[in-house]
Amino acid sequence: MITELHGIDIRENEPLKHYTYTKVGGPADFLAFPRNRYELSRIVAYANKENMPWLVLGNASNLIVRDGGIRGFVIMFDKLNAVHLNGYTLEAEAGANLIETTKIAKFHSLTGFEFACGIPGSIGGAVFMNAGAYGGEISHIFLSAKVLTSSGEIKTISARDMAFGYRHSAIQETGDIVISAKFALKPGNYDTISQEMNRLNHLRQLKQPLEFPSCGSVFKRPPGHFAGQLIMEANLKGHRIGGVEVSEKHAGFMINVADGTAKDYEDLIAYVIETVENHSGVRLEPEVRIIGENL
């Protein structure tokens, strides 16, 4: 118990595999669940004062946490999940579930968020990664975000300053943490929006191994190619290291089929990169983030 942070939900030596989509990850020294910006500021101020590292884990969907875990504070925004509408502008806190947020937009007959209807993760992580699918991405509807800087200051960042690119945003370099974000939507027809979301979710269910733990799409799309196609052509579908294998359903995914570890994921990623490069001459670049310490 840290007496200076009394009243905040903080768990010591907490295994992170219970919170990640991959079902891997060692312990966090301290795992914190702030309920509001005040509690978040208290955690960051304490960590900075004590020279303790801290990071925000988000919804841990496109992420691998190593088996040795993470030192210092890991902050999760599960309780910072409010969503508000002001006309055609939707504002969501960083911990809001991305899929549920698209359903709120649909309920109010607002169009623009359909592309994200099946993307797992949080609003904060989606902004960080400029998440996208089926021709849409966060940058297409993003207005601004409130962020927390490493020094504990809260500031607003515009779409221009975010410098979005393919699975990229400026905050990947600055280390700023999204607290909330605003999105510009447009009035639409409820039935049309609903039909499009159903169509995209059907495609996702057909093509992706949603029945297994995974980190989502492992590799960025190489120019002029598709990562899954290159992996398939290198005869890597079903290739397994430890408890993790390249999905038979979609070669761009790696799934945890038998109590796999983060090391299994990393070893399989490295093997796929090397094998694909030897086969096609194309070097794949991981989209998934890998953080933490090895055992």
UniProtKB/Swiss-Prot annotation:
One of its GO terms (molecular function) is UDP-N-acetylmuramate dehydrogenase activity. It catalyses: UDP-N-acetyl-alpha-D-muramate + NADP(+) = UDP-N-acetyl-3-O-(1-carboxyvinyl)-alpha-D-glucosamine + NADPH + H(+). Its EC number is 1.3.1.98. GO terms for cellular component: cytosol. Pfam families: FAD_binding_4, MurB_C. The active site is at R167, S217, E287. Keywords: Cell cycle, Cell division, Cell shape, Cell wall biogenesis/degradation, Cytoplasm, FAD, Flavoprotein, NADP, Oxidoreductase, Peptidoglycan synthesis. It is found in: Cytoplasm. Gene3D superfamilies: 3.30.465.10, UDP-N-acetylenolpyruvoylglucosamine reductase, C-terminal domain, Uridine Diphospho-n-acetylenolpyruvylglucosamine Reductase, domain 2. Belongs to the MurB family. Cell wall formation. This is UDP-N-acetylenolpyruvoylglucosamine reductase. It comes from Streptococcus pyogenes serotype M49 (strain NZ131). The gene is murB.
